[in-house]
């Protein structure tokens, strides 16, 4: 599939101009929203994206350790290790991280959505959430394949335990429901405990 050059994608990012005492200052829209403590997690969860998200979380903690951070998620999922780097940082930093699903939060995206601060995890009404077990593919000698299979099983068990803690569901329910792709509406995700509320309009 043809991929647009990065310069073209950058040109599509809107710029915001602010008036200050020293004159005009322009920001790309994401930098401007970062000033409001808003972070976007959009697209595939991979190492480069995870590093950027972690850096933004740490920066906002250093700016105001007692103010909430808002993480907007629209992601099909991706790398478990990259996702866990984001998740561990969310739990480690002092500010509460409020998560909001816009569009979709699937696989690792759903895990990060559920990992937000309790009472501060939200879905927009037409968003979709999907949970499942981690995917793995490996080629090589039989002994190496066995090692990787054990690693995937260990990750699966760990993620299921953490998801049970965040949702309040029994572990056996999580194990059953993540055995295959399990799609949920925003309301179903709230009933399941992945999020705490639906956001339909600004209060």
From Swiss-Prot:
Entries under Gene3D superfamilies matching the protein? 2-enoyl-CoA Hydratase, Chain A, domain 1
Write out the GO MF terms.
Answer: ATP-dependent peptidase activity; ATPase binding; serine-type endopeptidase activity
Which compartments does it reside in?
Answer: Cytoplasm
Gene Ontology terms: cellular component:
cytoplasm; endopeptidase Clp complex
Active-site residues, record numbering mapped to chain: 107, 132
- Pfam families documented for this protein: CLP_protease (PF00574)
Which transformation does this protein catalyse, written as a reaction? Hydrolysis of proteins to small peptides in the presence of ATP and magnesium. alpha-casein is the usual test substrate. In the absence of ATP, only oligopeptides shorter than five residues are hydrolyzed (such as succinyl-Leu-Tyr-|-NHMec, and Leu-Tyr-Leu-|-Tyr-Trp, in which cleavage of the -Tyr-|-Leu- and -Tyr-|-Trp bonds also occurs)
| A single BP term in Gene Ontology | protein quality control for misfolded or incompletely synthesized proteins
Q: Which PROSITE patterns match?
A: CLP_PROTEASE_HIS (PS00382), CLP_PROTEASE_SER (PS00381)
Q: What does this protein do?
A: Cleaves peptides in various proteins in a process that requires ATP hydrolysis. Has a chymotrypsin-like activity. Plays a major role in the degradation of misfolded proteins.
Q: Which family does it belong to?
A: Belongs to the peptidase S14 family.
SUBUNIT field: Fourteen ClpP subunits assemble into 2 heptameric rings which stack back to back to give a disk-like structure with a central cavity, resembling the structure of eukaryotic proteasomes.
* Descriptive protein name: ATP-dependent Clp protease proteolytic subunit
- The organism named in the record is Shewanella denitrificans (strain OS217 / ATCC BAA-1090 / DSM 15013)
Tell me the name of the encoding gene.
Answer: clpP
């Amino acid at each position: 599939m043809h991929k647009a050059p990065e310069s073209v994608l950058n040109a599509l990012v809107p710029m915001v101009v602010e008036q200050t005492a020293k004159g005009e200052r322009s920001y790309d829209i994401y930098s401007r929203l970062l000033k409001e403590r808003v972070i976007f997690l959009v697209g595939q969860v991979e190492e480069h994206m995870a590093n950027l998200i972690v850096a933004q979380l740490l920066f906002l903690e250093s700016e105001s350790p007692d103010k909430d951070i808002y993480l907007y998620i629209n992601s099909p999922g991706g790398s478990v290790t990259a996702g866990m780097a984001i998740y561990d940082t969310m739990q480690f930093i002092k500010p509460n991280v409020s998560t909001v699903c816009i569009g979709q939060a699937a696989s690792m995206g759903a895990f990060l959505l559920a990992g937000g601060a309790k009472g501060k995890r939200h879905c927009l009404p037409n968003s979709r959430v999907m949970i499942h077990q981690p995917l793995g593919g490996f080629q090589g000698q039989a002994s190496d394949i066995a090692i990787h299979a054990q690693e995937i099983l260990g990750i699966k068990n760990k993620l299921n335990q953490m998801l049970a803690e965040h949702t309040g569901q029994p572990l056996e329910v999580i194990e059953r429901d993540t055995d295959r792709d399990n799609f949920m509406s925003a309301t179903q995700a709230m009933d399941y405990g992945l999020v705490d509320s639906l956001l339909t309009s600004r209060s």
